Amino acid sequence: MLLKTKICRKADIGMKKRLSLILCVVLLCQLLSGCGKTTETVREPDDAYRCYYEIFVGSFCDSDGDKCGDLSGITEKLDYIEDMGFTGIWLTPIMPSPTYHKYDATDYYGIDPSFGTMEDFETLLKECHKRNIRLIMDLVFNHTSSSHPWFLEACDYLEQLGEKEPDENECKYVNYYNFAKDQAQTPNWYQIGSSDWYYEGVFWDGMPDLNLNSEAVREELEQVASFWLEKGADGFRLDAAKEYYTGYAEKNIEVLNWFETYVKSVKPEAYLVAEVWEGQGVLQEYYKSGIDSLFNFPASQQDGAIIKTAKARVTPQQFFSWMVKQQTADRLANPDYIDAPFISNHDTTRISAQCVNNEEQMKFAAGLMMMMPGSPFVYYGEELGMKSSGTKDENKRLPMYWSAQDLSKTPDAPQTADAVEQKFPSAEEQEKDSGSILQYYKNAIELRRSNPEIARGSISVPDGELPEDIGVLLTEWEGKVLSLIHISE
């Protein structure tokens, strides 16, 4: 299967970078008048539109030989990240936590010792900003760890309370979580010792849910946000936003609006993207919160629009028409929204599994994503075609495949991960191969960044019937870009 993508700019039409195998950028003079070759370079605006690289910190790069990925390891690999063309990094949680994934903090103001020190984080930020790479942090405030001091103190208080009613004057943390009696038969509620008290934990008993009705909790979270923004963080990825009040979208939207308003009052240029694992209709409602971005789950994963198109289950023009419909709906909810398309992340199977190791489909999918408006997110190792295995989370978070020979920078896999043999070559090998998946991603990102209309523009599809192997998309933003997809065997 061959994919050809042709791009012309109204004010700057010319031959663009040739992409290997299935993404070819060629002159499109027959479609637009006045096309002429040019060598002018398009400068990418320094704004919130970025190409993000998601890093699962413990699995990325080990700087000190302890076989755990760390912050200094990321700093060491910034040249690789910059060379790929990424202009933003999303770090999965780095705060102290008893679990390998760190999605349950015991301290919102620290760095997990396995990842390094606060000085290491500050160095990483400094080096990112030198390269004009923005860094956003994963912020988990649906819940904490059951080992968090707030929770431990509240539980200790309730166990000793007897028949009295809780009093915040005696223990301020008793209102930080969702505590109640008579919940023995209620799903996701867990008993505190042998007392009559229970607490809510939507994900599991080790992650007690915070009470976001509490003004004290919100003040705590505002202080947390201020702390990291003042350190230099460029924004946050908000975990599990639809579980703040499980089953109550309006309340969740209010929380997002409160947090977005507060963060922008501290740092107006900060960027927020939230995880709301839902379909298009629900996402449109959540955009009414005013948040910058929501991850585009309808585009992602095996049954998402990108992979369906890559597998020829829908036509290119159907894909483009879907994109237009989605942008129109989301802009009605939030005219300033920034889409956040992705193919895979730390909770999903990797692209290699979605495409059953079909290299052309994987490249096609990457090319499609890089033609979508907004800020695309690429999961570390996706640019290599790294494998996952089955549905076990640990298998989705395997060590970055830097080299087949030199394993000095390769962390150990999560403890319960299965042994998975990678099908495609390491980063070291793919960097030397002009036809590799890595080079395809790199070229696709370069194409996107050299045509800023793609990320920022208003999109439409021209009228008229097209053959099933052709798709045409018009993007308008300070000029015009016409993208044409042609698929052939």
Residue spans for each PLM region:
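A structural motif
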Residues: 86, 233, 374-375
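Hydrophobic core
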Residues: 23, 27-31
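Residue-level detector of conserved catalytic or cofactor/ligand-binding positions
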Residues: 485-489
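Positively charged n-region of N-terminal signal peptides that target proteins for export
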Residues: 2-4, 9-21
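Structural recognition of the beta-strand scaffold that forms the well-ordered cores
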Residues: 52-54, 88-92, 137, 237, ...
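Acidic/aromatic-lined carbohydrate-recognition and catalytic surfaces
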Residues: 35-218, 230, 241-289
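Active-site-proximal helices and loops of the catalytic beta/alpha 8
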Residues: 125-129, 142-143, 148-168, 224, ...
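Loop/helix patches that line or flank the sugar-binding groove of alpha-linked glycan CAZymes
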Residues: 266, 278, 324, 336, ...
